[in-house]
C-alpha cells in the first residue's frame, strides 16, 4: 500500500477500547485519511456482521456523495461503501437515500439497505456530508491482494442484492456458469472511455492486445469458453471471429452504434427505446460484473467494472491479468 501501512495495521492490533481512543484522537486532529484507512482495516472484524440496535447511537441519512450521480455506476457504489464505513465506524446506522433526477433511490433499485433489519426510531436522524470522504479504492488496488481483501470484505457484507436483482442475476449466472465449463472472463471497455481518455484514469489496452492475451490465458487455464463483458458490438464481433463458438454473453444492449451515430460525448447519454432504460442498463451492467467475478480467471483493462469484479471475486481467481499501461495524461 504505502509507508503508512505498518502504522495502520499496528493501530488495528490494539485492544478495542484503546483503538477507539486512538481513533478519536486522530479525528480531533483532522487526520481524516488515517482514520478512514484504519476504519477500512477495522471492518475486517466479524463483529460488523452481527451489529444490533444498541451498537448505534443515531441514524445517518446518506443523501449525497462526491458527485451528483444520475445513474448506477461503480463510482457511486464505491462512494456509498466509503460512506457506510464512515457511518458505522462512528456508531451511526447508515441509510442510503440518494435519489436521481427522477426521484428514484439509486441504491435501493439494486441493493438492500445495510443492516436492513435494524431500526432505531427513537434516536436522532442526521444528514451526511457526503462530500467529506477519502476512502475510495485507488486504481492500483486492483492488483494488491491485501486491498482486494479489504474492499472485497465490504462488497460481501454490504453489496447485498434485493430480491428482484438477485433473481435476475442468479438466472443469468446459471445460464453462463456451469460445473462442466472452464471460463475465462474478459472485460473490454470502449465508447466514451477510449474516446475521451479521461485524465488520471488507467489507459485501456488495444483490442488486438486483449485478444492475444485472452488466447494466451485460455490455453494456460485450459478454458473452453470466454465470458465477454463489453458495451461495444465491434468488440463482440472481433472476439467471435477470433474464438468461434467459444463466446458467452448475457442479455445486454451494445452502445457503440448509438454512441457514434448520435454525436454523443458520454456513455450515460446513450438511451435505448424501452421502459425503465436507466434501471435496465444498471441491472445488465451489474449482472455482467457479477458473472465476470465467477469465472476461473480474468483478463481486463483497469477500470471501475474490472475493479468491482475483482473485489467481488475476493482473491479467488486462478489467474488475474489486469493490463497496467499507466494513466491518461
Go through each PLM region and give its residues.
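Short, flexible loop segments at the rims of nucleotide/cofactor-binding pockets, characterized by
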Residues: 203-206, 274-279
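A short, glycine/small-residue-rich beta-strand->loop->alpha-helix junction that serves as a flexible
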Residues: 68-78
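Secretory-pathway luminal glycosyltransferase catalytic domains
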Residues: 8, 12, 16-58, 99-223
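PAPS-dependent sulfotransferase catalytic core
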Residues: 57-64, 76, 83-127, 297, ...
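Short, charged/polar "capping" segments at the starts of alpha-helices
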Residues: 102-107, 194, 232-238, 329
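Short His-Asn-centered micro-motif
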Residues: 76, 96-99, 187-188, 228-232, ...
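Catalytic donor nucleotide-activated moiety binding site of glycosyltransferases and closely related
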Residues: 187-193, 221-276
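A donor-sugar binding/catalytic signature common to diverse glycosyltransferases
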Residues: 72, 81, 283-328
Amino acid at each position: 500500500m504505502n509507508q503508512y501501512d505498518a502504522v495502520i495495521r499496528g493501530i488495528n492490533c490494539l485492544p478495542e477500547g484503546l483503538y477507539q481512543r486512538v481513533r478519536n484522537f486522530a479525528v480531533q486532529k483532522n487526520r481524516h485519511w488515517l482514520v478512514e484507512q484504519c476504519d477500512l482495516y477495522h471492518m475486517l472484524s466479524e463483529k460488523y456482521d452481527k451489529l444490533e440496535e444498541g451498537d448505534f447511537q443515531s441514524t445517518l441519512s446518506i443523501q449525497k456523495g462526491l458527485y451528483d450521480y444520475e445513474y448506477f455506476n461503480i463510482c457511486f457504489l464505491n462512494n456509498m461503501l466509503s460512506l457506510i464505513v464512515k457511518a458505522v465506524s462512528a456508531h451511526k446506522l447508515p441509510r442510503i437515500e440518494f435519489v436521481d433526477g427522477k426521484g428514484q433511490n439509486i441504491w435501493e433499485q439494486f441493493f438492500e439497505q445495510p443492516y436492513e433489519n435494524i431500526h432505531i426510531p427513537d434516536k436522532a436522524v442526521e444528514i451526511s456530508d457526503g462530500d467529506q470522504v477519502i476512502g475510495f479504492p485507488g486504481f492500483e488496488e486492483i492488483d494488491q491482494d491485501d486491498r482486494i481483501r479489504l474492499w472485497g470484505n465490504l462488497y460481501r457484507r454490504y453489496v447485498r442484492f434485493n430480491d428482484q436483482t438477485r433473481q435476475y442475476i442468479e438466472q443469468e449466472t446459471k445460464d453462463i456458469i456451469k460445473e462442466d465449463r472452464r471460463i475465462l472472463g474478459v472485460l473490454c471497455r470502449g465508447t466514451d472511455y477510449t474516446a475521451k481518455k479521461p485524465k488520471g484514469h488507467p489507459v485501456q489496452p488495444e483490442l488486438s492486445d486483449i485478444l492475444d492475451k485472452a488466447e494466451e490465458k485460455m490455453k494456460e487455464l485450459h478454458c473452453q469458453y470466454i465470458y465477454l463483458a463489453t458495451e461495444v458490438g465491434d468488440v463482440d464481433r472481433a472476439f467471435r471471429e477470433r474464438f468461434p463458438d467459444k463466446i458467452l454473453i448475457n442479455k445486454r444492449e451494445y452502445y457503440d452504434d448509438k454512441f457514434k451515430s448520435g454525436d454523443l460525448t458520454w456513455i450515460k447519454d446513450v438511451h435505448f427505446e424501452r421502459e425503465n432504460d436507466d434501471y435496465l442498463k444498471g441491472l445488465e451492467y451489474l449482472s455482467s460484473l457479477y458473472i465476470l467475478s465467477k469465472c476461473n480467471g480474468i483478463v481486463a483493462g483497469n477500470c471501475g467494472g474490472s475493479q468491482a469484479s475483482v473485489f467481488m471475486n475476493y482473491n479467488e481467481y486462478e489467474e488475474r491479468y489486469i493490463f497496467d499501461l499507466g494513466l491518461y495524461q
